[in-house]
């Protein structure tokens, strides 16, 4: 059906969302939001509609099914997500993020034409990249969503019920406590605060709407009043502080505004009611990923904004990590309503470019745990929207025989002392060059991400075999090229730690300048990596350095240049192990003395949960405890070492009183001893060991003081 455009606007896309299905017309409707250029409005939108063929229509679920706190309409979400790949406009909007589009729409805001600004032909018929024109992207408008609730688990492993698992040793496959916890959860005492640049909306349960009118009339929204503490574990998260003075109190209608539109199609018409927010991005506190508040708030908001509406309402469809069998690295996903991105990380300024093309965790990434996306080309389309399937296959075959698996970890045994494969010490003055291949490998896959290591981990877990092979080939092409260059430049490789490569040279290096080293590397690598991607992450002269293979899957690195201020490496206890290794490079290293040097940092962070979190490898051999909340649905799940073993935890929860500081101190000492032990074993003499044990007890007492 030909549609005549009456609105022509330009802008950068913010997101594509599923609106609903118009069953009478067999039409799927998407909502596309964008930041318009050259206009006073901060946000604009259009609808993309598509008729569904018989084959696809027969696969549409009859209904969204019964909603839970962690999942609503997952089969409908998967169905519509698969349809996106067959729509050229949707594919362009999701795959060419950061470009300015020209939107042509009819009177009902239905898209009738789309092209990248600067291209002659519309999407689907043109090539080449679009120009920026006079568009100057500004920082998007933020909102912060803070929620608290009390959760009680009557039949799961939450709270004290988790103690029943305390005797199970950590071995084999990791336990997943959240499954039982979310089967029967009771939520109460809900408090919600939304802060924007205009003011603050608050919905403390049962307040009668004094602070805000609530998402559902005067009942305050969802839940009743209470202290907001989670059952079995307190929360350290707090809403961000605003400017001085009393902030403006907002009502829910100040934040969300329904807009009525009419869609005409083949002699039929239907009314639509999208809801426009007073912001572009919502940042939620981490607890909102498991405390059940966010879905209920949006459910009440949708009910309020569509009350007495006789048209086709938006669909509220979502999936949370707790709805995935193994949990997820990806955050919760709202496929449609409320039509903006919800991010579960510290709030910061972002642009439209970042939201569409720069975010490490693409919208809908959590769907990759479900068929038909899991390890399929559909998953690749979500992970790498800018890379075609045939291009992925070509790159998968480009590497030939791969010598290293993705994320290899090893030391150069040719440089290790006899009898040791886990320790490498360079005692003489040398140049140390540290390279990181992750960003270049991601760029070879067409992925522009902030955390390339995390992105590659998601490829390993959820990508297709072709995408995994393409990533492995890119990694091997880079690694073999780097090692070839190193041999020619007089460097020897000392260690490979996943994407990091450590090169040492006791001879005169080709240059003392890191930029010249980078240029020499690029010239050697040829056409493999794309331009403008840095490889050098560190370069300098060292009097000595040490590399230790620890827990079989990580390399700890100590450098003499870090001796002047070892605590600067201690952003976490895990990082303190590198600082401890640096301290073994002194003239007369003493284990107890090294521990004493680290104590100021340990003491300063003794109440900070995030500082003491470790991955599961550090909990090996200790009895495992369930978390007080279903936080293990967020993968990979970190742990705390406690008196009864190890407990799965989250940085948003307060540090428990039974943290086993002695276990952390002992692990630090073990690391130091391994770096100092001579080939063939041996250890401290009796007097030195007694002194170390005495210091261990003393330091444990200091850290345990409130």
From Swiss-Prot:
One of its GO terms (molecular function) is ATP binding. Keywords: ATP-binding, DNA replication, Helicase, Host nucleus, Hydrolase, Nucleotide-binding. GO terms for cellular component: host cell nucleus. Residues 203-249 are annotated as: Disordered. Signal peptide: none annotated. One of its GO terms (biological process) is DNA replication. Belongs to the herpesviridae HEPA family. Associates with the primase and the helicase to form the helicase-primase complex. Interacts with the origin-binding protein. Interacts with the polymerase catalytic subunit. Component of the helicase/primase complex. Unwinds the DNA at the replication forks and generates single-stranded DNA for both leading and lagging strand synthesis. The primase synthesizes short RNA primers on the lagging strand that the polymerase presumably elongates using dNTPs. The primase-associated factor has no known catalytic activity in the complex and may serve to facilitate the formation of the replisome by directly interacting with the origin-binding protein and the polymerase. This is DNA helicase/primase complex-associated protein. It comes from Equine herpesvirus 2 (strain 86/87). The gene is 40.
